[in-house]
Each structure stands twice: as structure tokens, then as C-alpha cells.
């Protein structure tokens, strides 16, 4: 049938993405790495990055082993869980780790080649950096969809059809597939937190001793922490960001598929149910094809200005977005999904919310606009006012993204439900579809994102290898472009986490249905005396059954705990960076003291020691925050039951979302306020205002690169853990 033919688009698109990723990687490897000095520096960075990843995967491996044993006991011993969970969990984690690894490997090979290309022209530098970033983007979407289509085909073949309720089968398939999202989430959390602590310990350490105390510029080869700093860009911004978005991407598609299956559970219409399940996968598949077109369209003139560069990247992204809108209408019409026009509009809503969040992030954090320029000016009265203004700016900047998400939630709910607030099943499906729409162009948005650290490293390479001022000027242009795109990318990651979190929250109820069925609960006795069969219960029925109202103390307790989790998690990651940076500062000072001739350039600093300190610090510090995130939903479920978990997830989602935007934007603005001064405003480099903004930038580092981004994962991971543990919560909760 037409539907099954359309479904094959999904695996085909994913394989195509991987082929193009391989092609771009090959093209990049053909380019020259430049002078012997450049090659040497690139090799040192690559070695540091790989040794860090090896360590990180060891720790993640141990955690995964523990969790798999736990899941196996629950699945095969107590039968409170689906038998596929332990295996699905492992594949999710494996593919998430693989995409980070491949993206990072490409990035570490691309930086010297980008610097070398910038010796010839700006355009060739842009092309190499951007296409190497595209490897990351395409690997993430390719592996994500490959994993999804593989599991769908496998489960569809082995799960028997249910003769009584034929619509039940797809519900079981989609809820089982959701669990591999937890594998992706767990791996992503370690990548984000570990990478974030690593990169910022090195960055803060290098800045404090180098810029502030010794007065040497950034990326100066005399600074012992420079190699660690450049390794950190790859570890945090490439591997961490990739794993984060891999998880949002899979999470949104899987949650929406589960909601689609649920929306049709009490009609006998298996055909329409199948259409609703594959629609999000198809939108993602088409998004991949159009991202590839967008990637090829990015190029610029030789004597391009900053505006031209931004324009060419924006052109590629906008082209993909416009094409995806047209293609969505086409694909959903071909699919003949009920209400296809309005559901296609929900995709547009998701894309628009993403664009609004990106634009507002740019406005608040780019040095071309007033907020960041005013922030630089506040440096005239010293560092304290820079900190005060930056925190104020970050808090104010939450308004537009939050309002955008609220409008997006209401609009997509109404569009999909046929403008009927009581049609909850389809309405929630619409919210999921909006999340999928927002992430449909991930292939290219992630390419512009991974481009940032590659350009940053190219600049570091050019500086350390002593290439001319002309080359530095070009790599600086590429780099500051990267900062703007990275800020937009962060906004995107946070916005998608919020919508994905909502969709996951809704699919949690689906898991509860499956959990109750597995326990043999055939009927639900409602508080008002009615009896509803578990198989046919609606979302509203479950809310009544568990008495999920705002006045229920269990819901309220859960909400307070969820809000606290966001702050607790931020506090742990901020302190971790502070401690690790402290070790780094001590080490850099020791080297300046003990190794004679570093500052005159006669002796080479011990770069390896600094890399080792960052690696050790990140390892020590990443375990506790991650375990807390995994244990909180389990503990809440065992004590307060389903009702408490729903409260926890809502509290964590709402607080975590706003807190993440605040931290990302405050950090980005502090960073660019310092850049604005370095461009020669308010006295330029080395002046008093510059010193004040460097302090702001240093505080902003863990804000924007550790705590802020980790919150996106916390939001999704808590929902994922709740989903995987639903059977346990239903079976054994205290209250």
C-alpha cells in the first residue's frame, strides 16, 4: 500500500544522510593540514580529545552496565517491564555515543585544514569548516532515524497482533521504542556534563591566569592550558551538543509516534493509526533530504563581510525551512492523514517557534545589538556592574522564548485537535508534531552549530602556529560568525527540549496504560463510581483515576521537587566547573613558576599535564549530577506514585526550561560583550573595561556551556526515566 511505500522513505533517507556525511568527511581529509607546526598542534588536540572520550566512555559503560542489570531484573525477574527494554536501552546509548565520536573525530581533523584554507581565502575556509560541521549534523539525523526504523521493523515483526483490540499492537510497539530514548538521554547527559566541565575548567583556567594575570592573549602557545582549552571546544561543543540534539531528535519522533498510536486506541481504525505513527518519521526523513540541499547551497563571495557570511549560512538554513514546509503538506497529503492540512500547520508552528527563539537569542547575545553593547558599557564601572547587568539581561531574555513556546503549545494543540480543547489525544499529538517540525531541519542547523567549534579551533591553530595577521583576521571572522550560530543553536536545543519534554510527559500516561495492563488491571474504578476498561481509557480518564488535580498534595509536592531539581542540578555543575578550574589555575601558575623561560617563549610548557587535569576533573565531577537525575524520578515514583511523578516532570520542565534560557543567554551576552570591547570599543584590549568584561565572560562560561545546556538533558532524561520506570511505579508505589 501507499503507506508502507512511504514508510521506506525513512530508512532510505537515513542511509543517504550517512553516505553524504562520509562524502563530506572524505572531501575534507583530502585538503592539506598546512605547516609542520600546524600539523603538530592539531595532533596534540586530537590526542587530548580522544583520550578524554576513551575515559568518558569507560565511565558511561559502567553506568550502563549497572542500569542494564537493573532493567533485566525488572523485565525478566519481576516482569514489571517490557522484555525488550534492556536491549533497546543499549542501542540508544551506543548510537548516541557513536554520533558524538564521529562528529568529534571529524572536527579535530578539520580545524587545521580550515586554518590552512583561510591562508588562501575566506570562502574556502568557510566551506571546509561548514561541510565538516555538516558531517556531525548528518551523522546525528542519519543514525537517529536508522535506529528508529530498525526498531520499528523488528518490533512490528515479532510482537503478535491483539485479536480483541487491534489498535493495541502499535501502542505496545511505540511505547517500547520510547525506551531506547533513555539510552540516548543517559549517554547525552554524561557527554554534556562531562564535556561541559572539561571545556570550561580549561577555558576559565586559561583565561584567569593567561589573560588576567600574565596578560598574554587567548590561544597563546605560552599558556600551558591552551591545548586543553582547544580540546574542550571539541569535547563540549561538538560531542556534547551532538549527543544532546540526537536525543531531542529521537525523543520528539518517538514520543509523537506513541501519542499518534494513543490517539486512535479506542477507534478500530488501524489504518489511520499507522498513518499517525509514521507521520513524524516521514517529516524527519524529508527534513534530511532537504537539509542536504541546504548544505550544498552555503557559499560566499571572496571579499565577504561578516554580514555576507551570516547571510550565506542563514540562506542555507532558511532554504531548508521553506522547502520543508512545502514538503510536509505534500507528504501528509500523500499519506491522507486525517486533518492533514491542520497537522501540517502544526509543523509550521514548530519551525516558527524555533526561528523566534533563535532570533531572540541572537538579539540578546550578539554584539551587533543594544543589549550586549549596553552590557559592555557597564564595564566602565568595574566587574560587579557587568555581573549585575548580565544577570538582569539573562532574566529578561526569557520572556520572548517562553511566550513563543506557550503560543506554540496552544496553537499546535488547537490545530491538531480540530480547535476542540476536549480532544486531548489529537491535541497532544499536535504538540509532538510541532517538536518534530522544529527539529526537522536538524541536519543543517546542527551543521551551522558544529561549525562554531571548528572555526574556533582553526583560530587557535593559526594563533599558535604563528600564521600572519591576515589569516587571523579571516579565522576571527569565521569564529565570531560561529559564536552567533552557536547561540542560535543553543536556543534551538532548549526550545526543542521544552516541546519534546511535553510530548514525553504525555507519552508517560501511555506507558502507565501498558504497565497497568501488564499487571492484569483490566478495569479502572473511577472515584465517581464509574468503571472504564484500561485498554480504552482516555488521557482524561487516567487523570481522573489518579486524581491529578492541582489541589492534590502529591502533585504539588512533585512540582516543588521538580523545580528544585533544576536548581540543584545547576548548582552541582557550576560548583564542579569552579573546582576543576581551581585545579587548572594552580597547575598553570605552577608551570609559570617552575618551568623557566615559558613567558619568553624559550621553553615549551607541559600541555599534557593540563589536559590530564581537565580529564580527571570532568570524570570525577560528572557522576553525581547524572545519578541524581536518574534517581529522582524513580524515588518520587516509589513514594508518591504516578501522581507525584507527573508533578515532578511538570515542575522540572517549566523551571528547567526558563532557567536554561536565562543561563544560555546571560553567558552568551557576557562572552560577546568582551568581544565587543576587544573590537576596539570602550578602550579596547588591555583597558580597564576589558578586564571587567573578561570577568563577566569567565562567569558566563559555565553558565552557557555547562549548566545551561545540561538542563535540556535533565528535562528530557527525567521524563525518559519516568517512562522506563512506569511499570515499577504502577506496581510498587507507596501512596
What are these regions (language model features)?
Residues 1-735:
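Hydrophobic packing and interface segments
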Amino acid at each position: 500500500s501507499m503507506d508502507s511505500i512511504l514508510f521506506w522513505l525513512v530508512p532510505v533517507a537515513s542511509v543517504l544522510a550517512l553516505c553524504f556525511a562520509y562524502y563530506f568527511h572524505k572531501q575534507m581529509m583530502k585538503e592539506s593540514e598546512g605547516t609542520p607546526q600546524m600539523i603538530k598542534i592539531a595532533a596534540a588536540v586530537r590526542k587530548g580529545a580522544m583520550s578524554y572520550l576513551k575515559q568518558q566512555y569507560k565511565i558511561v559503560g559502567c553506568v550502563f552496565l549497572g542500569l542494564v542489570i537493573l532493567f533485566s531484573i525488572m523485565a525478566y525477574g519481576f516482569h514489571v517491564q517490557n522484555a525488550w527494554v534492556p536491549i533497546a536501552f543499549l542501542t540508544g546509548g551506543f548510537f548516541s555515543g557513536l554520533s558524538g565520536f564521529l562528529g568529534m573525530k571529524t572536527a579535530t581533523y578539520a580545524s587545521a585544514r580550515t586554518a590552512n584554507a583561510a591562508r588562501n581565502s575566506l570562502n574556502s575556509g568557510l566551506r571546509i569548516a561548514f561541510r565538516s560541521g555538516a558531517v556531525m549534523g548528518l551523522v546525528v539525523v542519519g543514525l537517529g532515524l536508522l535506529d528508529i526504523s530498525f526498531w520499528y521493523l523488528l518490533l512490528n515483526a515479532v510482537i503478535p497482533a491483539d485479536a480483541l483490540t487491534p489498535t493495541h499492537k502499535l501502542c505496545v510497539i511505540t511505547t517500547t521504542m520510547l525506551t531506547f530514548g533513555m539510552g540516548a538521554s543517559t549517554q547525552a547527559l554524561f557527554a554534556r556534563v562531562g564535556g561541559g566541565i572539561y571545556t570550561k575548567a580549561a577555558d576559565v583556567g586559561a583565561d584567569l591566569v593567561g589573560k588576567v594575570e600574565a596578560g598574554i592573549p587567548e590561544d597563546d602557545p605560552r599558556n600551558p592550558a591552551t591545548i586543553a582549552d582547544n580540546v574542550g571546544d571539541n569535547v563540549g561543543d561538538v560531542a556534547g551538543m551532538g549527543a544532546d540534539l540526537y536525543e531531542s531528535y529521537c525523543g520528539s519522533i518517538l514520543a509523537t509516534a506513541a501519542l499518534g498510536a494513543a490517539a486512535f486506541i479506542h477507534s478500530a481504525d488501524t489504518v489511520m493509526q499507522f498513518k499517525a505513527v509514521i507521520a513524524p518519521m516521514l517529516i524527519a526523513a524529508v527534513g534530511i533530504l532537504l537539509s542536504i540541499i541546504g548544505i550544498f547551497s552555503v557559499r560566499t563571495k571572496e571579499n565577504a563581510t561578516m554580514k555576507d557570511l551570516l547571510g550565506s549560512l542563514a540562506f542555507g538554513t532558511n532554504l531548508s525551512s521553506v522547502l520543508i514546509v512545502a514538503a510536509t503538506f505534500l507528504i501528509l497529503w500523500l499519506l491522507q492523514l486525517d486533518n492533514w492540512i491542520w497537522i501540517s500547520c502544526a509543523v509550521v508552528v514548530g519551525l516558527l517557534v524555533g526561528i523566534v527563539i533563535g532570533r531572540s537569542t541572537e538579539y540578546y547575545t550578539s554584539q551587533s545589538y543594544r543589549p550586549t553593547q549596553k552590557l559592555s558599557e557597564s564595564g566602565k564601572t568595574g566587574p560587579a556592574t557587568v555581573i549585575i547587568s548580565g544577570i538582569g539581561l539573562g532574566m529578561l531574555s526569557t520572556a520572548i522564548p517562553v511566550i513563543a513556546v506557550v503560543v506554540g503549545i496552544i496553537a499546535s494543540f488547537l490545530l491538531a485537535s480540530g480547535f476542540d480543547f476536549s480532544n486531548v489525544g489529537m491535541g497532544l499529538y499536535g504538540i509532538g508534531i510541532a517538536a518534530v517540525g522544529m527539529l526537522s531541519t536538524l541536519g543543517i542547523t546542527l551543521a551551522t552549530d558544529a561549525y562554531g567549534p571548528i572555526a574556533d579551533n582553526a583560530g587557535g591553530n593559526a594563533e599558535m602556529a604563528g600564521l600572519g595577521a591576515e589569516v587571523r583576521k579571516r579565522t576571527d571572522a569565521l569564529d565570531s560568525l560561529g559564536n552567533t550560530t552557536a547561540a542560535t543553536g543553543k536556543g534551538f536545543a532548549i526550545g526543542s527540549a521544552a516541546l519534546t519534554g511535553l510530548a514525553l510527559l504525555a507519552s508517560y500516561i501511555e506507558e502507565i496504560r501498558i504497565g497497568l495492563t501488564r499487571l492484569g488491571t483490566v478495569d479502572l474504578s473511577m472515584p465517581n463510581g464509574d468503571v472504564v476498561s484500561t485498554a480504552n481509557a482516555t488521557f482524561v480518564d487516567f487523570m481522573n483515576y489518579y486524581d491529578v488535580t492541582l489541589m492534590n498534595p502529591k502533585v504539588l509536592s512533585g512540582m516543588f521537587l521538580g523545580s528544585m531539581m533544576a536548581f540543584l542540578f545547576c548548582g552541582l555543575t557550576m560548583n564542579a566547573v569552579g573546582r576543576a578550574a581551581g585545579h587548572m589555575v594552580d597547575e598553570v601558575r605552577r608551570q609559570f613558576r617552575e618551568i623557566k623561560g615559558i613567558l619568553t617563549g624559550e621553553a615549551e610548557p607541559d600541555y599534557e599535564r593540563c589536559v590530564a587535569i581537565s580529564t580527571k576533573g570532568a570524570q570525577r565531577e560528572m557522576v553525581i549530577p547524572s545519578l541524581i537525575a536518574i534517581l529522582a524520578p524513580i524515588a518520587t515514583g516509589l513514594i508518591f506514585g504516578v501522581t507525584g511523578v507527573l508533578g515532578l516532570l511538570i515542575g522540572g520542565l517549566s523551571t528547567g526550561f526558563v532557567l536554561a534560557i536565562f543561563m544560555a543567554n546571560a553567558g552568551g551576552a557576557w562572552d560577546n560583550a568582551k568581544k565587543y570591547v576587544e573590537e576596539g570599543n570602550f578602550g579596547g584590549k588591555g583597558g580597564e573595561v576589558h578586564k571587567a568584561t573578561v570577568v563577566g565572560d569567565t562567569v558566563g562560561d559555565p553558565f552557557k556551556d555547562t549548566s545551561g545546556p545540561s538542563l535540556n538533558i535533565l528535562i528530557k532524561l527525567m521524563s525518559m526515566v519516568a517512562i522506563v520506570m512506569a511499570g515499577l511505579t504502577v506496581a510498587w508505589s507507596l501512596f
